Amino acid sequence: CRRACEKLMEDRRAGKQLKDMKGIVYYGEYLAKTDPLGANVPNPVSHVAYGYATQMCVLNPKDGKLELMVAAHDVGKAVNPLSCEGQIEGGVVMSMGFALREQYPIDENCKPIQKYGSLGLFRAHEVPKIKAIVVDKPGLNVACGAIGIGEITSIPTAPAIADAYFRYDGIRRYNLPLADTPYERKG
């Protein structure tokens, strides 16, 4: 947590060397201020978000297959830009599966009834071009300026793909995996 890192940095600024800090544990806690569920306030705060992400899907006009995914993510200061790009690409590919093919049926005891290989995961040769845009904003005064790049990479993918198909054929799709696409699994 950022507050623990700030305590560590206080020791570093005071002249402590890393080798002398071995075994020291730093604790920190952050509790976001949110409104209770159902609060009768004009603009309730239900959660705290640190990053922002947006994605766009481009379909091939001839066959309706994904041609390009553009994913822009505000990460604050990109401490490792190449790693950020990889995280974005991985999140997009994972969510393409959620959006278009993956099904994870379970039995009445919540036990999977399909093998991993038959879930509908995208294979490398099926993945479209992905343009990962790391929005790097230096100057934030927290955690070396980094905001983070994790789960947020997979959130905008399905809506972007659903919107691309709506623009392609005028059909709104409300369930995942999306029906009536070239990726729909038969049977």
Stretch-by-stretch model annotation:
Residues 2-187:
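C-terminal catalytic domains of large/alpha subunits in multi-subunit enzymes
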